[in-house]
Swiss-Prot record:
One of its GO terms (biological process) is protein transport by the Tat complex. The keyword Cytoplasm does not apply. Keywords: Cell inner membrane, Cell membrane, Membrane, Protein transport, Translocation, Transmembrane, Transmembrane helix, Transport. Part of the twin-arginine translocation (Tat) system that transports large folded proteins containing a characteristic twin-arginine motif in their signal peptide across membranes. TatA could form the protein-conducting channel of the Tat system. It comes from Vibrio cholerae serotype O1 (strain ATCC 39315 / El Tor Inaba N16961). GO terms for cellular component: TAT protein transport complex. The gene is tatA. This is Sec-independent protein translocase protein TatA. It is a single-pass membrane protein.
Amino acid sequence: MGGISIWQLLIIAVIVVLLFGTKKLRGIGSDLGSAVKGFKKAMSEEESNSAANQKDADFETKNLEQAKTNASAEVKKDKEQA
């Protein structure tokens, strides 16, 4: 009752073709398709770039052993200064 039937859709399609013509509709379709293709390509390039350059932080990570030796060296310096 309130929905659009197939006949109404066909009438709308015929009116659109008469207004714009088949060449213009084909051109719009190809432009839209190339835009979607370019968007997908850019998204896939961005994902590959971000995966390759992804870091947890901006500084270099240190070994746990190095952190312990650096901490003990700092404690020794603090004791010597005091």
